[in-house]
Amino acid sequence: DSKILNEKRTLNIYLPQTYDKTKSYPVIYILDGSMNEDFLHLVGLQQFFNMQFKIPDFIIVGIANVDRKRDFTFHTDLKDLQKDYPTTGHSDKFIRFLGEELQPFIDKNYKTDKTKYIIGQSLGGLLATEVLLNKPNLFTHYFIISPSLWWDDESLLNKANALLSAQKDDERFVYVSVGKNEHKTMVKDADSLFQILKNSGKKKLKLEYNLMQDDNHATVLHRSVYEGFLKLYPSSD
């Protein structure tokens, strides 16, 4: 039951097979985390990586969607977007839900450490970017995949430099990825986000950019996450 969102939300939670209450675990938060969305795929990837590479055991929290167009977009005055997305513009509430309700709930009920990942694609990538620019301390690791930065005439990209310059230089990992076969605007905007982050002068910001050569918007997520983990945990040697 979320007081901020004023509705019940379903969480899908995966605990590692070796879950031990005397240890603490990093947490991955998945924005499109319904059973029929990305949750099972990403749990499977994590189990595969556990067998093949030196990757930590993660707790994985899939946030099942109710209305992603409402939750993952900020307000826009553009009439055509308001028409196509009638419930739009409540990402501020959803971000408050993440920081004030969801994370404290997970930290209270499970053995978590300070490492928190967020994985978002498309509108979820837009939301992850908004969190990175406005509430960066909510997560330590950002997987921003094919973000819908075209939203509101790219207004978030246009504000990014100013928002970044107001931030402290904290340890953070940001992975931006997009499929080469996606719409040209998606590719251009993802590249722009990476360039803005790269030129932000943040010494402790670890950045990776991946233009997925063979992927489109429908196929990009799984391979992107796989490659992102490879960049973080290269080999079991």
Predicted feature descriptions by range:
Residues 1-237:
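Non-catalytic cap/lid and distal C-terminal segments of serine-dependent acyl enzymes
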